[in-house]
Amino acid sequence: MPLPTNQLRLAMVAGEPSGDLLAASLLGGLRERLPESAQYYGIGGQRMIAQGFDSHWQMDKLTVRGYVEALGQIPEILRIRGELKRQLLAERPAAFIGVDAPDFNFNVEQAARDAGIPSIHFVCPSIWAWRGGRIKKIAKSVDHMLCLFPFEPAILDKAGVASTYVGHPLADDIPLEPDTHGARIALGLPADGPVIAVLPGSRRSEIALIGPTFFAAMALMQQREPGVRFVMPAATPALRELLQPLVDAHPQLALTITDGRSQVAMTAADAILVKSGTVTLEAALLKKPMVISYKVPWLTGQIMRRQGYLPYVGLPNILAGRFVVPELLQHFATPEALADATLTQLSDDANRRTLTEVFTEMHLSLRQNTAAKAAEAVVRVLEQRKGRA
């Protein structure tokens, strides 16, 4: 059944950089399948805006980390959410698509669904890892879930939630065999000698909590392995400014800070020390040995620990179903422990070969042409709605 051509409008919300990346991928697929006159609006980042998205609010207004840290931003977030819901109910777009940010989007999706506006959620929350009770909220709020990982649809099906496995766009974008030599040339790094990429996060709170520990670990590694070089991407000038005091405190480090280009920096590396998050999946798709770490405030950590189900937090370990790379979290993330684990990842050739096999299998499983599959799923929802109209 053909879709209407008269000013189709889709509302979308992405709440953080990883969501911006996913939403931009989806927008690219939708623009190929929907009328050229279709409009896309809501809350998004620069990648979405580059796809013709009209962002009515700044995405970083929604970007928070942890329970305690979010308290100060709750009034502003609630104000934005209220305005967005009123706008949706007044304008009645063809669908609302929430991209990740479940604590924000599920409330909006339920309001849309209750008003007869199809609600689609892109990125199934990790109900299989922690806070499994959220599946009840999903069942009330979401008409269709777009899943990044292959084991998620079976979980949702038990709760009566329609879903489509679409894979992960990073698996489509990253080549199966990374060009380490080319990445080193691009960054002006020596072709020979060990290189370790260090990624302490991109938020002020993350840098404050784990940045000093990562830099101390780098100093220890350089003492033990004098020929090692480090590369650290800074996504924005603001992040570089946050890192600068730590750089100044360790002038002896053979450290290259890049302007963005985190994927190039990781490609150039022999091993990676990385804060937990989506970037760990990127590192796995690049077939890199890594050490995963994080630090959050004590109370936030206690809440997360009590509500968790799995013994691991890093996506490579979750997808493998076992520990394939080490995780050093909270008080276990000492400079000495991080240095020991990272140098082991750097030097263990047998482990490197095993990880390459594991990560290649993971890569092939996730490589699904996500933009096309996600866009096709959205179009099917729109067609079904039109068929019922």
From Swiss-Prot:
Protein known as: Lipid-A-disaccharide synthase
Keywords: Glycosyltransferase, Lipid A biosynthesis, Lipid biosynthesis, Lipid metabolism, Transferase
Function: Condensation of UDP-2,3-diacylglucosamine and 2,3-diacylglucosamine-1-phosphate to form lipid A disaccharide, a precursor of lipid A, a phosphorylated glycolipid that anchors the lipopolysaccharide to the outer membrane of the cell.
Gene Ontology molecular function: lipid-A-disaccharide synthase activity; phospholipid binding
EC number(s) recorded for this UniProt protein: 2.4.1.182
Pathway terms, separated by semicolons: Bacterial outer membrane biogenesis; LPS lipid A biosynthesis
Family annotation (InterPro entries): Glyco_trans_19
Enzyme class name: transferase
Catalytic activity: a lipid X + a UDP-2-N,3-O-bis[(3R)-3-hydroxyacyl]-alpha-D-glucosamine = a lipid A disaccharide + UDP + H(+)
Gene Ontology biological process: lipid A biosynthetic process
